[in-house]
Amino acid sequence: MLTIKVASANPAKINAVASAFAEIFPTETLDVKGIAVPSGVADQPMSSDETLLGAMNRVAELARVEADFRVAIEAGLDGDFTFAWMVIEHQGKMGKARSASLMLPPAALSQLQQGKELGDVMDAMFNQDNIKQKGGAIALLTQHKLSRSSVYHQALILAMIPFLNPDLF
């Protein structure tokens, strides 16, 4: 059995991790659990560097927890775009990948620059409740063609590259 700890209690993130690891390890029994840990950065990171730091900090917070893999997903902004960093730790090695980016409407960006969080802004713009734990801004802006979990799934597999090719890393 592989134990995977996710540095979040957000179901969208936990489901993305479970889905990606099930694809990578189709014959393994997986125990995927989320644990809320602090990021050490702003609730709404405003740059790629700050977002990556938040993911790295979350994985570091999980170091005290027994697991085969420790995973953090930190969403943030980079200019007019939102995206997320994936950081995976396994036996002291790190894998990282950045998700696809999506443009945000100018009305949303102006509210984010005033200190609001993207999930709250999207809830208000689209008359939703807690979208960040469902399909996310991605689902709303793609008219549900993609979801937060589906976009994170791909990036998580990319973050696993060092572990899938250990002789190269």
Range-by-range predicted roles:
Residues M1-A67:
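N-terminal polybasic phosphate/anion-binding patch
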Residues D43-F169:
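Anionic-ligand binding patches
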